[in-house]
Structures are given as C-alpha cells and as structure tokens.
C-alpha cells in the first residue's frame, strides 16, 4: 500500500529521531525471510534494544541525512531492513548475525558506526563487541589485578621467610577494600 505525503513525513521523522540517538546501523537484505522468522527477529530486537524497521530506501536515506549514518545513504539499495542499536553498539550486529545463522537469505549489506562505513563482513566484529556489563567487568578486573599481584607477592615473600599467612591476610584485606 502506498503511503501519502504526511505518512512518509511521519516515517522519515521517526527514523531520523531513531538515527540521531542510535549507536550503530546495520542494513540487511531480508528477501526470502519468512514471516515467522521476521516476527521472531522483531521480538528479539525489542528485547535487546534494537530498533528494527523495513522502510523504502529513499525514505531511509532522507532520515539519515544530518546524522552519523549519512555516509551510508548511497549504499541503501535493494530490499533492506534497518537495525539501529539504541543501547549498545554491538546489539544490532549480534541480532543480525544470530538470525543469519538460521536464515542464509538474511545478509548484512551496510554496517555503520560512529560516522564510518564498514564492509558488510564487519558485522562479525560489531557483534563481538562486549556488552556494557561485560566491558565494566573487564575494566574492574584490570583495575583490581595490580592489587592482587601485590598481595600474591607479599604472600610469597612471607612464605619464604616463614610467617606469610598472617601478613598476606592483612595485605589481602586492604587490597580488597
């Protein structure tokens, strides 16, 4: 069904608002994907903070003008679905990669993040980015490791001199605090 001018303007405004707030964009060919597969993908997209929409490419190109994703405007050709990561940069990549495993017709065509356009093969790189919680856990581990190394060194010196357990326990308590 064809959209009238006001409906097209609403679609462009909605997509422009989403594009302005999004971290990354993946445009993927979806031809040959069944309705049940698309429904499952949309459900998972909502759960993972990904805005997923199928719109005409000309409307999408107008919507991304003035955003970081304007570099992708000339690559929007063919039947595409647009996946915008709203919460984490890698969320759309993980979604497309997961559904591409079970559906060989779903293929990423455009990958854009931070105003840069990447080859479609970079969807794997984007999908492998850690989530916010994983990144915070890695940071905490990196920050706590020097104190843990110091505690192990003090314990080793104490063990070598014969009274290491009490000294190491005291150092370990201060290192944890």
Swiss-Prot record:
<dbReference type="Pfam" id="PF00466">
    <property type="entry name" value="Ribosomal_L10"/>
</dbReference>
<protein>
    <recommendedName>
        <fullName>Large ribosomal subunit protein uL10</fullName>
    </recommendedName>
</protein>
<dbReference type="GO" id="GO:0006412">
    <property type="term" value="P:translation"/>
</dbReference>
<keyword id="KW-0689">Ribosomal protein</keyword>
<comment type="function">
    <text>Forms part of the ribosomal stalk, playing a central role in the interaction of the ribosome with GTP-bound translation factors.</text>
</comment>
<dbReference type="GO" id="GO:0005840">
    <property type="term" value="C:ribosome"/>
</dbReference>
<dbReference type="InterPro" id="IPR022973">
    <property type="entry name" value="Ribosomal_uL10_bac"/>
</dbReference>
<dbReference type="GO" id="GO:1990904">
    <property type="term" value="C:ribonucleoprotein complex"/>
</dbReference>
<keyword id="KW-0699">rRNA-binding</keyword>
<dbReference type="InterPro" id="IPR047865">
    <property type="entry name" value="Ribosomal_uL10_bac_type"/>
</dbReference>
<comment type="similarity">
    <text>Belongs to the universal ribosomal protein uL10 family.</text>
</comment>
<dbReference type="GO" id="GO:0070180">
    <property type="term" value="F:large ribosomal subunit rRNA binding"/>
</dbReference>
<dbReference type="InterPro" id="IPR043141">
    <property type="entry name" value="Ribosomal_uL10-like_sf"/>
</dbReference>
<comment type="subunit">
    <text>Part of the ribosomal stalk of the 50S ribosomal subunit. The N-terminus interacts with L11 and the large rRNA to form the base of the stalk. The C-terminus forms an elongated spine to which L12 dimers bind in a sequential fashion forming a multimeric L10(L12)X complex.</text>
</comment>
<dbReference type="InterPro" id="IPR001790">
    <property type="entry name" value="Ribosomal_uL10"/>
</dbReference>
<keyword id="KW-0687">Ribonucleoprotein</keyword>
<keyword id="KW-0694">RNA-binding</keyword>
